[in-house]
């Protein structure tokens, strides 16, 4: 029996989210939850205390799953005491569901909601996106260290934890992720960003960090789409060519323009410092430094 049939046999309303997840229920259709559970490779005929749909909703929650389970008292009969779920039950439930349903739910949400336009969500008619990378530490396990690797230190020893590299594409208007890619630490962020260029919509401008300065990446973004542009900070001493200069004032007219901007504030500015007619002298305060005329002269 598939996992979905087991969930339908669990209760009359198996796909209703927990009370604290009503915010997500307003935006995620229950049909998506039902479809993503069919992607799970696990099949069972047991009546689970923590069904798959509950696990999906808890993954969507922006808080630790153990806290959600303890606070909501998720169990088959909703009773407290001996029927509370153990800590290991939450981990086992996530392992039963697997990564495929959660990944499909993310891709479906990004495809359906990621490119939506909102009021004032444009810059000269272009939609704003951004690509950036980050690094995360993973649990120190041999299989994770072998796959992700870790950063080197000043000594021969490696970092204490394996490091995972993440590159994500975000809609700057709604802060919804359109795409995200994870890879080992040694893999370049530019290569990961190149794999998500097809996700960027047309009539858009994408912001990059200066570390993404790659000719292949930027030309592919501009040429493979329709009216797609990019923007990133310029490197120091970068070789450039001036194509067209905007309406700027001539350098020779800058002093006159500054005098015009001063207007009635001429009294604030010192245009010319008057030169004294006699040499400047340093005077000594007689009260603070009294002079003793009877003192012997300095040699």
Swiss-Prot record:
Task: Name the Gene Ontology biological process terms.
Answer: DNA transposition
Pfam families referenced in this protein's UniProt entry, alphabetically: DDE_Tnp_1, Nterm_IS4
Annotated region Disordered: the residues are 276-299
**Tree of life domain:** Bacteria
Instruction: Write the signal peptide boundaries.
Output: none
Which regions are flagged for Basic residues bias? 276-291
Report a single Gene Ontology molecular function: DNA binding
Q: What else is known?
A: Could be the product of a pseudogene; missing an internal segment of about 130 residues compared to orthologs.
Record NCBIfam families: transpos_IS4_1
Q: What is this protein called?
A: Putative transposase InsZ
Q: Which species is listed as the source? A: Escherichia coli (strain K12)
Q: What is the lineage of its organism?
A: Bacteria, Pseudomonadati, Pseudomonadota, Gammaproteobacteria, Enterobacterales
């Amino acid at each position: 029996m598939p996992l979905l049939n087991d969930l339908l046999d669990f209760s009359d309303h198996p796909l209703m989210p927990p009370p604290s997840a009503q915010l997500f229920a307003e935006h995620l259709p229950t049909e998506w939850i039902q479809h993503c559970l069919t992607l799970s490779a696990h099949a069972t005929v047991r009546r689970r205390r923590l069904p798959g749909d509950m696990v999906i909703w808890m993954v969507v929650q922006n808080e630790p799953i153990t806290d959600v389970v303890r606070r909501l008292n998720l169990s088959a009969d909703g009773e407290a005491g001996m029927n509370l779920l153990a800590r290991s039950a939450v981990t086992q439930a996530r392992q039963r569901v697997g990564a495929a349903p959660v990944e499909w739910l993310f891709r479906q949400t990004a495809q359906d909601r990621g490119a939506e336009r909102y009021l004032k969500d444009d810059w000269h008619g272009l939609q704003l996106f951004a690509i950036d990378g980050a690094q995360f530490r993973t649990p120190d396990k041999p299989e994770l260290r072998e796959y992700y690797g870790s950063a080197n230190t000043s000594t021969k020893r490696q970092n204490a934890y394996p490091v995972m590299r993440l590159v994500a594409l975000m809609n700057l208007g709604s802060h919804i992720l359109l795409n995200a890619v994870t890879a080992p630490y040694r893999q370049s962020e530019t290569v990961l960003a190149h794999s998500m260029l097809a996700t960027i919509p047309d009539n858009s401008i994408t912001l990059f960090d200066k570390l993404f300065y790659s000719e292949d990446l930027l030309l592919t973004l501009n040429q493979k789409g329709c009216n797609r542009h990019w923007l990133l900070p310029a490197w120091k001493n970068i070789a450039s060519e001036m194509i067209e200069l905007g309406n700027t004032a001539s350098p020779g007219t800058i002093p006159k323009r500054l005098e015009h901007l001063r207007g009635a504030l001429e009294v604030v500015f010192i245009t010319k410092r008057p030169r004294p007619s006699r040499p400047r002298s340093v005077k000594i305060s007689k009260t603070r430094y009294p002079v003793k005329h009877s003192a012997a002269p300095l040699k």
